[in-house]
Amino acid sequence: MKDINKYRGIIPAFYACYAPDGSISIEGVKALTRHLIAKGVKGVYVGGSSGECIYQHPDERKAVLEAVMSEAKGKITVIAHVACNNTADSVELAAHAEKCGVDAIAAIPPIYFHLPNYAIADYWNAMSAAAPNTEFVIYNIPQLAGTALTMPLLQEMLKNPKVIAVKNSSMPTQDIQLFKDAGIAARGEDGFAVFNGPDEQFVSGRAMGADGGIGGTYAVMPELFIRMNELVEQGNLPAARAIQYKADRIIYKMCEAHGNLYAVQKEILRRMYGLELGGVRAPLPNLIPEDEVVVAEAQRMIEAAVAEL
């Protein structure tokens, strides 16, 4: 029987951290890691969408993970997303992540070409084989990857004993129940986890059986999601929903900017905590002067919501 307790809770998706010249800021990575640990999160999800993984070289992704682990190892759960758009680089990152001592590796399916289930399974299992002592998380995000996790594909992957969880970012919350049922049938009640992916419906996902969440806005307002999670565990859904509504309004506000959502969030963290995380890497759009109004209002909304907890 596997123990999924280390996956239960709030796990922010870790932001890419850049120096002024556009290179990886190792100091920024370490500072953000320390900041999130101090906020009381369960863990971090490194090298995913929020980490701008598809715009980074594998060597950069290795450097980021090493910097995170230098601060986080033994303190919080670390899940490393290792997928690249070719198997060889993905396998290399998986082996590196295991050497770093992460709790789990994760992967989206290959993007662009719509591959058959058996090819996706081969791709994921190749990564898992390169990290044979590390648990594996399937990342389902069909609206961006272009490929959805089907039940036949999940059943095939559950033949791999290292498959411990699904990070589910599809919009229908019923998918959480489908994946959870399949995982429990294969692993037992406490042997398989499902993470809620869409931040805007965290409470809904938890109500449908998600064990916790991995989200791209958690790092800018972890207090709100930690409190939501506590209230769900206490059975106080009305109070959890009230905070969810506040978080959603903040997300909608941040999305009003010309600059990418991650650029907005990193600027808010700079203003609130002095974290120098840089902007975003092209072709993602950076902030423009006109975004000042959105950034300032989103920061105000976060501070007000946290103060009301």
Describe the residue ranges of each PLM region.
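C-terminal alpha-helical cap/extension of soluble enzyme domains
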Residues: I11-Y15, K39, A210, T217, ...
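A general structural signal for well-ordered alpha-helical segments in protein cores
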Residues: V29, R61, L65, S90, ...
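Secondary-structure boundary/capping positions in well-ordered alpha/beta enzyme cores
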Residues: K75-I76, T134-E135, P161-I164, E276
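Active-site beta->alpha loop and helix N-cap motifs at the rims of alpha/beta catalytic domains
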Residues: K2-A148
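Short, amphipathic alpha-helical "lid/cap" segments that border enzyme active or binding sites
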Residues: I26, K30-T33, M151, D291-Q299
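Catalytic alpha/beta core domains of metabolic enzymes, predominantly
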Residues: A130, P142-D248, H258
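Alpha-helical structural signal in soluble globular domains
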Residues: K39, A63, A67-A72, H96, ...
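Short secondary-structure transition/capping segments
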Residues: Q56-D59, N117-I120, T150, L178-F179, ...
